[in-house]
UniProtKB/Swiss-Prot annotation:
It is an enzyme of class 2 (transferase). Its EC number is 2.3.1.89. It catalyses: (S)-2,3,4,5-tetrahydrodipicolinate + acetyl-CoA + H2O = L-2-acetamido-6-oxoheptanedioate + CoA. This is 2,3,4,5-tetrahydropyridine-2,6-dicarboxylate N-acetyltransferase. The lineage of its organism: Bacteria, Bacillati, Bacillota, Clostridia, Eubacteriales. GO terms for molecular function: tetrahydrodipicolinate N-acetyltransferase activity. It comes from the Bacteria. Keywords: Acyltransferase, Amino-acid biosynthesis, Diaminopimelate biosynthesis, Lysine biosynthesis, Repeat, Transferase. Catalyzes the transfer of an acetyl group from acetyl-CoA to tetrahydrodipicolinate. Belongs to the transferase hexapeptide repeat family. DapH subfamily. Pathway: Amino-acid biosynthesis; L-lysine biosynthesis via DAP pathway; LL-2,6-diaminopimelate from (S)-tetrahydrodipicolinate (acetylase route): step 1/3.
């Protein structure tokens, strides 16, 4: 079944109809040499095993063989999850530990995603863009090339509340720490959003906005460019 993931209602339907998953990993001290483990991934022998699979299948193996198990420890990080994480091995970018990136996200060459950042389904990150620590990009949020999304900043998604138009951030935009870009807002290339701003309306190219709600306070000049320049070495 195909879904139009540019539409918030289609994204919601995709999530609703996706097979929910509760994967677990279990370390077992015991004799599982005769256990039926065809439907899971497992490693080990001689009294020690690692089991990986859906929680209901693992639970059945543990219960069926409890008389042969001395100890076990279970690890679990999600419950009835609808969307898997992005396969980072296919990404030509720097992704730091602790970033949470859902499947069906596009990340450009030499982009950087820092610790604690969260990027939801359908988001697009341009070449050379940095998503700083604890920043959030909602479903279908679009960031252009060489953008800096500051620590703790939020780019709203198209899901709750549903919005046909995603947030769109142009190229070479700097968004300061803890700023919020509301649903459907477009920010023109080369603009700067001051830290802590709440942007509720579209921003033209080449301006500086600040405040809540954010207002244009000046044009981007050489002094502003000097204060907001990006470092290429961080993207190598």
């Amino acid at each position: 079944m195909s879904y139009n993931l540019t539409d918030p209602y289609e994204i919601a339907r995709f999530i609703k109809e996706s097979k929910k998953s509760t994967p677990v990993k279990v370390y077992v001290n015991g004799d599982l040499s005769k256990a039926l483990m065809d439907d899971i991934e497992w490693y080990g022998a001689n009294g020690f095993y690692i089991l990986i699979g859906e929680s209901d299948l693992i639970a059945k193996i543990i219960l069926d063989n409890k008389h042969l198990i001395k100890h076990f420890r279970l690890e679990n990080d999600r419950r009835n999850s609808a969307i898997p994480m992005l396969d980072l091995l296919e990404v030509d970018a720097r992704i730091e530990p602790g970033a949470i990136i859902r499947d069906k996200v596009t990340i450009g060459k030499n982009a950087v995603v820092m610790m604690g950042a969260v990027i939801n389904i359908g988001a697009e990150i341009g070449d050379g863009t940095m998503v700083d620590m604890n920043a959030v990009i909602g479903a279908r949020g679009k960031l252009g090339k060489n953008v800096h999304l500051g620590a703790g900043a939020v780019v709203a998604g198209v899901l709750e509340p549903p919005s046909k138009e995603p947030c769109t951030i142009g190229d070479n935009v700097l968004i300061g720490a803890n700023s919020v870009i509301l649903e459907g807002v477009r920010i023109g290339s080369g603009s700067v959003v001051a830290a802590g701003s709440v942007v509720a309306e579209d921003v033209p190219e080449g301006v500086v906005v600040a405040g809540s709600p954010a207002k244009i306070i000046k044009l981007v000049d050489d002094k502003t460019k000097g204060k907001t320049q990006l470092l290429d070495d961080l993207r190598k």
